[in-house]
Amino acid sequence: MKELAKQYDPSQVEDRIYQFWLDGGYFHTKADPDKKPYTIVMPPPNVTGQLHMGHAVDNTMQDILIRTKRMQGYAALWVPGTDHASIATEAKVVEAMRAEGLTKEMVGRDGFLERAWAWKTKYGNRIVSQLKKLGSSCDWERERFTMDEGCSEAVKEVFVRLYDKGLIYRGNRMVNWCPHCNTSISDAEVEYEEKDGSFWHLLYPVKETGEMLELATTRPETMLGDTAVAINGEDPRYAHLHGCHVVLPLLNKEIPIVCDEHADMTKGTGVVKITPAHDPNDFEVGLRHDLPIVRVFTYDGHMTGAADKAAADALFAAGKNTVNEPQVLDCGKYAGMTTLEARKAILADLKEGGFLKEIEPLKHEVGTCYRCHSTIEPMISKQWFVKMEPLAKPAIESVEKGEIKFVPERFTKNYMNWMKNTRDWCISRQLWWGHQIPAWYCDDCGETVVAKSAPCTCPKCGSAKLTQDPDTLDTWFSSALWPFSTLGWPNEDSADLKYFYPTNTLVTGYDIIGFWVSRMIFSGLAYTGKAPFDTVCIHGIVRDSQGRKMSKSLGNGIDPLEVIAQYGADALRFMLVDGSTPGNDMRYIEKKVEAARNFANKLWNATRFVLMNLPEDFEPGLPCEELLDMSDKWVLTKLNQVAGAMTDNLEHYEMGLAAAKINSFIWDVYCDWFIEIAKPRLNSGDAQQADTARRVLVYVLDKALKLLHPFMPFITEELYQALPGSAETIMTQAWPTFDAAHNWAAEEEAFEKVMDYIKAVRTMRTEMNVHPAKKTSMIIETADAAPFQNAQVYLAKFAFATDVTFTEKYEGSTDGMVQVSTHAARGFIPMMELIDREKELARLNKEKAKAEKEMAMFGNQLNNPKFVERAPAALVEEIRSKFAKSQDKLANIEQSIKALG
């Protein structure tokens, strides 16, 4: 029998246990026709990232599900992997090169990619090793990377298929441009931040009438690119200006006044400036009115100059411009300024010219890059796009039909809003690290060739001069294929794909429903004909103890690895789920981690106690029913109930409720009550009773460890292996389930009557400061004496009774008696010589107030028709029972007060 250390030290256990699991191959899963598959794909963290609390909660939840299903007999596969994270990784490599005095352009594309792969090799295993520290039971033999050979093949296959179907196209469109990262980003990657700003009220002179048109803008620096002013055609204030022009201040250029519904008569003056190259709404107005598109910003956030204009003019002169190709303005004195520098200079010139009427302060939402938080510039740019409408329709229908459900259900609305309002997806990025777009352009005739491999010649003119598009695909393009590309797709004969796909549960945060979840759903349906998973389990974010989002700027981030080093991975995992509810944010509270650590210590010490009381020749196994006493049947019934309830909780992704139940069972039921109750039997001269107590102790502990294992895998494995008769690992043991044969409701109720009475006596003695050594006789008045008569050994030890008399109605003298009351019994204990009568009355009145409060609470629930009609019948019945018990208890207390006079 394995001997346990006196104290539990996670640092001495966790790494050793994890290596034991790896060496045993327990995480590896194969297709098994005799088992039902259960598959989770890990949301791939950035390959060069570090474990944060978001990863910790996400992977803890996945591990709980996968360990539970493994124990339930499923072929449970958890596919791990990492994401190449184009923007983040490229930024890291560029930063490292900058320290060497190098730029991307200096080393060239091949040289840069060589450095990027070296960076990935150096730092790529960091996040994986950190996930292992957390206890993640992934099938590491199947670890994938979004740029590995298989995933890259899937990306090219999808791109070519969509292009051939006309669902991928290239064109000049309004995109979200990050001038810092120097790339386009998708709508989903724009984060909105409230910032202080201004409405600058400008005056544009009307050429035909000489009057001034007032309009307001938050971006005066864009005015150089204005190509029209819009009014609403129904606005009577400006009916006389239809067909007129304004003279653009500073440039002295005529631009038309157009009538368009974009101009809202109810807002401001009802006049808006139109800059088609730098505002998505203005771009649409420009298309409707065939306005020129004039770009005034460079892609790195400066004002355009002569060189920029010359390059654009050359493009037009050569006939290489495409639809919606913007003209470029030489901004003259403002050329080369940053956009903010230009704003100040332009406003100063407008003021000097009499064109700035007033400045109105305001707070407004400003789009920022989700990576670097720079302000996003709407820009016309030639990019690759995916047509979303044909792909979104079946993805919407799949969720509407219930093929995919969101937990909690309320997040279905987030998904639907995103899918129903999505624009075409900009998938090209001006980066070098990532999947290079599989498109080539003929240098001689300009033909575009899209193929999975490089073409030798142009199919149109036969030229061998072909240049591949330098851009890469949006990172989310490859991660959208993750549920099936990791299982062998596009090889549809893959055994893994046939067996493990579709996957079952996706666990993720609500912040990437648009980024990722929606794209996986439409991708799975479009390319495999099947929804990629049946359930999306949404969790919230981990906030600090004050409820604030963790961030570098606040300096309130918590490093999970530091928590693990101090408290152990099990304590961190348990804290993250205990009390949590699906979809809701949670707070990191150190005292909760300490409580989880204390729970682990409690379990360790309880197991040591049990093991120390086992003989060397002990053989585990539950005794026959005839040998079980009331307390045995009580604890086995409680265990049975917990197993059933936890199974139901986990089926509904209520991990917080399941964690709370096993915590309460182990701490309150097993450690605080059953072990204490078992001690007299262990130490008695009755060998049969002692053996029964030992067998029940070990049986219940074994089952409790299995129920706790998905939540706290390390300590449960260590303790399980110390139990006599244990198998090689707890991981592959059967999950405990509800067993009707171990459901002794009558004995449970009877024993809880005794427990309630003992608790009442002990509470009274504590409040009265009566020393445990001072024992007394007692009279118990009860209509059901049998449970108390069968528990006299417990009354003696835990209620400090020297002898007990039972009666249905006590009518004797109460002089010198202290009285305790429960719903099932009233105790009369001769202790007045040890206590103060006034104190006893005060205690009873305190108990009375407590009972009245309980009765009122339960009564209010039962008097609420909505509760009675809508709550589950079992819950209503439970409240009725509690109400009746509180009534009985109150009546007993009132009798006791009356008896004291």
What are these regions (language model features)?
Residues 34-42, 64, 100-103, 128-135, ...:
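Active-site-adjacent bridging/hinge elements
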Residues 54-66, 73, 82-83, 151-154, ...:
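Structured ligand/cofactor/substrate-binding pocket environments in proteins
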Residues 67-75, 96-109, 129, 133-138, ...:
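Secondary-structure transition/capping motifs at alpha-helix termini
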Residues 181, 251, 372, 443-445, ...:
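Short Cys/His-rich metal-coordination motifs, predominantly Zn2+-binding knuckles/fingers
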Residues 200-207, 244-249, 367-371, 440, ...:
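Short acidic-hydrophobic surface loop/beta-edge motif
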Residues 201, 417-477, 481, 526-569, ...:
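Feature 926 captures the class I aminoacyl-tRNA synthetase adenylation module centered on the KMSKS loop
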Residues 391-409, 497-499, 853:
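Residues forming anionic-ligand binding surfaces in small-molecule and nucleic-acid pockets
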